[in-house]
Amino acid sequence: MIRIFATLAVAFLLVSTSAQAQQASRLDDIVKRGTLRVGMTGDYLPFSYLDKATQKFRGFDVDMAEALGKALGVRIEYVQTSWPRLMQDFEADDFDIAMGGISVTLDRQKKGMFSTPIMREGKTPIARCADKEKYKTIADIDQPGIRVIVNPGGTNERFAKATIKNAEIKVYNDNVTIFDEIAKGDADLMMTDASETRYQQKLHPGVLCAVHPDTPFDFAEKAYWLQRDAALKDFVDQWLHMAREDGSTQKIYAAWFE
């Protein structure tokens, strides 16, 4: 009988220890180590940009990341990734959260979790201002001789390849200087997120114009892509809700988008 009780006690201890281990979350780990690892491409203004001279990130989602770190009571460790490598780096657990203009997709949802959306989006053209009336529809764009430029590995390339059958698709690796290709006439247009077309129009006044950014070709949303952890998602969602309600998000948004 004593042996039975001893065996049961050991079993109970093992179950209790296992349950405690299972209760530990990624959120707990982040707080314990004092850092939140944030993956960013650093090539997608106004969301994120890596200044090669200073090796520092800046952008809307950089400011949001810093605000999230402050709410968590931890420092931010930025991990540079790229659009072609984003999924691979996420699966390798190189970062806890991906920020910097991340579009919600089902392929990404399979691998992790998304926060509540931060922005409604959609693909729309940006072209030289003199030509913007030419490219209002997919049918206008998908014509022989039209050069559609895209950056590789993300939703822009995916959208272009799904919709363009007759026009030329030019893949251009540098997402920072890609708009200069349109400005100087080496490409005719790019179809990208409406928020980016507005920002690039502001950077290139009178040269590049966003085409119907208020009525994009498709529906999409931006959100933060999290490693699969319910506690972390709950925290990020609650932080986003409170930041919207107290005006913090709008203040950061205005600094970059208005």
What are the language-model segments listed below?
Residues 22-101, 110, 246:
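Extracytoplasmic small-molecule ligand-binding "clamshell" domains
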Residues 23-25, 155-172, 209-213, 240-258:
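Ligand-binding clefts/hinges and TM-proximal coupling segments of bilobed small-molecule sensing domains
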Residues 27, 116, 129-146:
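Flexible hinge/capping segments at coil-to-helix
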Residues 34-40, 58, 138-153:
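Short loop->beta-strand "edge-of-pocket" segments that line small-molecule binding or catalytic clefts
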Residues 75-82, 149-151, 167-175:
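Short beta-strand-to-loop elements that line the ligand-binding cleft
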Residues 84-88, 102-110, 159-162, 179, ...:
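A ligand-binding cleft/hinge motif common to bilobed small-molecule-binding domains
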Residues 120-127, 194, 198-241, 258:
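Periplasmic-binding protein-like
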